[in-house]
Amino acid sequence: MFLKAYFSSDFTIVDVRNVSEVKEGKIFSNSISIPLAEARDRVNEIPTDKPIVVHCAGGYRSAAASSLIQSKLNGSVKVFDLGDAVKEFQ
């Protein structure tokens, strides 16, 4: 639990799971929910004052979204893909 709280405070966390998945429960309470299908149009909603960590349920969508977000933000902030390591926080 300590690691989860520490992790949540030092990064902006973006959850790219579908709305129905998020309704079943957030993995990080302070994450921003932006489904992968909406990521391109909603990048401007992501704060850039801290490094960004992108997660989904297993790694595939977060890989695509982190690449897209990094590209849209032109490298102005570090963007990390949590990948399948998200399972360690569930």
Task: Tell me what each language-model feature is.
Residues 1-12, 16-90:
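Rhodanese-like catalytic fold shared by cysteine-dependent sulfurtransferases
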